[in-house]
Amino acid sequence: MSKKQKNETSAKAPVKLTRAEKKEIQAVIRKYKGDGKPHSAQTSIPYEAMYQDGVCRVTPRTFSKCIEFTDISYQLAQADTKTAIFENLCDLYNYLDASIHVQFSFINCKIDPKQYAKSFEIRAQGDDFDDIRSEYSDILQDQLVNGNNGLMKRKFMTYTIEADSLKMARARLRRIETDLLGYFKSMGASAWGLDAKQRLEVMHSIFHPDGEPFSFDWKWLAPSGLSTKDFIAPSSFRFGNARMFGLGGKYGAVSFLQILSPELSDEMLADFLNTENGIVVNLHVQAIDQSDAIKTVKRKITDLDAMKIQEQKRAVRSGYDMDILPSDLATYGQDAKELLKTLQSRNERMFQLTFLVLNTADTRQKLENDVFWASGIAQKYNCSLVRLDYQQEQGLMSSLPLGASHIQIERSLTTSSVAVFVPFVTQELFQGGDAMYYGINAKTGNMIMLDRKRARCPNGLKLGTPGSGKSMSCKSEILSVFLCTPDDVYICDPEAEYYPLVKRLHGQVVKLSPTSKNYVNPLDINLNYSEDENPLALKSDFVLSFCELVMGGKNGLEAIEKTVIDRAVQVIYRPYLADPKPENMPILADLHKALLDQHIPEADRVAQALDLYVSGSLNVFNHRTNIDIKNRIVAFDIKELGKQLKKIGMLIVQDQIWGRVTQNRSKGKATWYFCDEFHLLLREEQTAAFSCEIWKRFRKWGGIPTGATQNVKDLLSSPEIENILENSDFICLLNQASGDRKILAERLNISPQQLRYVDNSEPGEGLLIYENVILPFKNPIPKNTQLYQIMTTRLGEGATV
């Protein structure tokens, strides 16, 4: 203010107010001065600042950070696995000292169903497959409605410390986060720290239970003058009612768990979370300094001893036995001494636990029903769920993952008692992007959506007894690949089961038989056949496998026989490698001649075995390839090859598909290969070794093979089965015979609880193993659909073709 303005101001005569005007002004001041209570939704949210790296200043000297972690399969795990998880969880709690407050938050929040359904939508393309797309989409939508995928289940751990400055807080929070992530990793759970935007999104989901989209950008704050709270707050809070509150257009209520049971179950928390309703469960855990805890227990024992002495004195004065004490006093004394022993001699500490349950609903009646349901869960475990009277606001704010509890209702528990609330139930498999449908989780009802290409090794196996739904499972996956990806699909079909599906998808069926005019040359090769400079090395392995099957015998090929075959291979491919024209491609007759030209007994013996396949009645493979494969989906029907040629036919088909894989690799296209009766390729030593080598190479070249068989014992008895299993991150187990169940449980580390799902299971039900996750699943396909008709192999149910 300038001197002139000051002079002008001072020159003005003071305004005199009447008594009435003074009263009016004082009333206005009182009105707007406030009563110390928040008067906006934003000011009710109890934190001071949120920083971009995810650190939150809750109070001037209190800072918190948040970790999100994934679920793991705990309830169906092996007993020793459950014990290991529990012990690691105890170690995590014991890591916490009295300066760290921890809050576990389990949030079941709804998401926008329309947005969610878009991920399953298969758009019409105006071709002959739109009716299939529509029917397939309807099945996915039905599963979405029947399951509880409308809820997103998320798990968080928020940890809070006190510090004199933000800089000091950040340094310590970072160290704690590193340690906590290590504990989660040891339990098999993925975990990661959240930044500020992610933390705000979590709080937004609690304040907007309907799944309203969250929009926020740091650039918006300065121009708008808004704070981070403005982007997460609901339209209003209403805390007038003592036992519930209003949240925008919703109703909510917070209750606390009164732990009355002498023993706690590790299934209680899982039961609270196993609901189709929106629920938020919070566990606030505060460690007590060990020396303080021991002193407190000792004081209690001293107090109990004093009471015991008083009772004994009273007994003496009254003239009855001084050893007769009130039962409660004796029990409390024993419990206190046992607790002291636990704290002093075992790896146990003391914690204060506050267990809060937040329910939200559209109407008061629905809210009361949800709270009643939650109370029933507590009652099941001999506990009580008590509504927070006149503390609903504090309860709601304590349910935010900020790491601060405003409810002073605590229960003292030891490490193992707190760890009983295991934060894991069962893992879900729900990947976004190009994931495909593989059924529903039999434990939770949620859809299983997977993208096998994301696996370390996408190779797969499908094992099951006859009638267990093995072929149906393969066909369902083939259909998903066809509808959802541009990939090629090849099928080795020993029983002619895939014809209706392939024809309906306008695919190509290549029928191989002694009387067929479709020919496939087993000696076909292309210059991309192997990643080595010389493609003959891998092709020679194939020819050795072919000759092994031709010659038969239990001991396979002898060393000299392998040498003469390899020598012949080098000779017959020279013309083609010099001038790669189709007419220079060798056939079996060329191999036969090259063997005879060596003029040694071992070569003659191999050539004589080849006679039947060169000039005899089984010469179907002594021709150049005359089929032109241009289709996306191709089935090789080898049913009519007969028993003598079946294994040879499967080996040749596998080699043909390997050639297609090498061609597709240069185009950047994935190639799916489904091989039924896969165990036949693993019986003979050389053939098994070649098949295993191809199995390994598929992954590098963009191939995704799937072997299916009902002869699990034969498969598992192969010397190469270990390599096959190690290179297969996708295994679908359907119903299994008793002996097979035991072998599979041992080989694949399946728990007895999980094994129940492959014991007399219905068709299309079993266990899905994806990388390290084992899930029980169901894959029902309605019988009244076109899809069922073209996929079933049951007599009288399939489509007429």
Per-region residue spans from a language model:
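P-loop NTPase motor domains
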Residues: 72, 79-98, 109, 271-273, ...
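Conserved lysine of the Walker
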Residues: 470
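Hydrophobic positions on the alpha1 helix immediately C-terminal to the Walker A/P-loop
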Residues: 473
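Post-Walker A helix-loop "phosphate-sensing" segment adjacent to the P-loop in P-loop NTPases
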Residues: 480-490
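A short helix-turn-beta junction within AAA+ P-loop NTPase domains corresponding to the substrate/partner-engaging
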Residues: 506-510, 720-733
